[in-house]
């Protein structure tokens, strides 16, 4: 039987996926501003900025010229981190909540490495004392 934390975790996962699907649909189907900006970016324009160009327009042009893999990494890494955290809340063992988040995972791996080094140093000191 599921406890309250697991139920709330599943509700959080389902809401997160629903909001993600709605945002994905909005960006790629409904939002005409995004489509207009994408078309402006593709059309050939002179390389010299106009005198009437504002800094926001030039910033939009520069941001749209970034490669796709960079945009994908900027959005997908935090997206998957939040999703994996919500998914870890659905597990039965409360001690395993949050282990899939990158900073926590790195801290655990480094802590295990340090404890392994300390243990190996203790073993080598014991061997020196015994001989």
UniProtKB/Swiss-Prot annotation:
Keywords: Golgi apparatus, Membrane, Transmembrane, Transmembrane helix. GO terms for biological process: lysosome organization; regulation of vesicle-mediated transport. It is a multi-pass membrane protein. It comes from the Eukaryota. It is found in: Golgi apparatus membrane. The chain crosses the membrane at residues 8-28, 66-86. GO terms for cellular component: Golgi apparatus; Golgi membrane. Required for mannose-6-phosphate-dependent trafficking of lysosomal enzymes. LYSET bridges GlcNAc-1-phosphate transferase (GNPTAB), to the membrane-bound transcription factor site-1 protease (MBTPS1), thus allowing proteolytic activation of the GNPTAB. GNPTAB is involved in the regulation of M6P-dependent Golgi-to-lysosome trafficking of lysosomal enzymes. LYSET is thus an essential factor for maturation and delivery of lysosomal hydrolases. Belongs to the LYSET family. This is Lysosomal enzyme trafficking factor. It comes from Xenopus laevis (African clawed frog). The gene is lyset-b.
């Amino acid at each position: 039987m599921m406890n309250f934390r697991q139920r709330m975790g599943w509700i959080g996962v389902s809401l997160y996926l629903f909001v993600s699907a709605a945002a994905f649909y909005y960006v790629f189907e409904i939002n005409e501003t995004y489509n207009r900006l994408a078309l402006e970016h593709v059309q050939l324009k002179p390389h010299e900025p106009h005198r009437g160009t504002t800094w926001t327009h030039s910033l939009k042009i520069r941001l749209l010229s970034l490669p796709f893999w960079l945009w994908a990494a900027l959005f997908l890494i935090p997206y998957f981190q939040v999703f994996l955290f919500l998914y870890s809340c659905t597990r039965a063992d409360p001690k395993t909540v949050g282990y899939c988040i990158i900073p926590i995972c790195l801290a655990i791996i480094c802590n295990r490495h340090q404890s392994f080094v300390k243990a190996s140093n203790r073993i080598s000191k014991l061997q020196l004392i015994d001989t």
